[in-house]
Curated annotation (Swiss-Prot):
Gene: GSTU6
A Gene Ontology term for the protein's cellular component: cytosol
Molecular function per GO: glutathione transferase activity
GO BP term, pick one: toxin catabolic process
Residue span(s) of domain GST N-terminal: 5-84
Name of the protein described by the UniProt record: Glutathione S-transferase U6
List of residues binding glutathione: 15-16, 41-42, 55-56, 68-69
Family of the protein in this entry: Belongs to the GST superfamily. Tau family.
Keyword Nucleotidyltransferase: no
EC number(s) reported in the record: 2.5.1.18
Amino acid sequence: MGKNEEVKLLGIWASPFSRRIEMALKLKGVPYEYLEEDLENKSSLLLALSPIHKKIPVLVHNGKTIIESHVILEYIDETWKHNPILPQDPFQRSKARVLAKLVDEKIVNVGFASLAKTEKGREVLIEQTRELIMCLEKELAGKDYFGGKTVGFLDFVAGSMIPFCLERAWEGMGVEMITEKKFPEYNKWVKKLKEVEIVVDCIPLREKHIEHMNNMAEKIRSA
């Protein structure tokens, strides 16, 4: 990385979408400036950099603006070649992309929908979420991480979203969503993630995060 390179990340402390970008930048050893945003009072910088989406994360690299977390992760991987994030094999790379979409589209949609329901109306959505997470359980069989022996793209996407976001929301509601008995590979993977310094450095503080997720769930239910 050149000495005069500018790398800025606009994000939110509790957002898995910006946490995963920090994980990738730390894996690559790329120095960056982090700018905390407030989506209820969006900064003029965020609106200028992302006038259409108006969402985080936003990466700024030498004046170029990159949005959407999956796109940003791939940009980081292609710009700084060392410590690859995506699998080198084309088939494995395509599979990682498909599973990342499963996480951020299907699991997120059903998982967050479960937060909006009362206890009685939550059961069907919880079971649907478990069925989707079982796809990840099968993919992790016999592996330390999704890519094998080292963390990468899908670990950042799934890790930031499920154990370190959705599970905390469910914990706040008293729901044990992903048991070790039914999901042994998944739980082994989460334990391995907690041993990775760059991941741990980017995980929001647990109690503060659970409180935040509880407040968000209350807002969803009362909307």
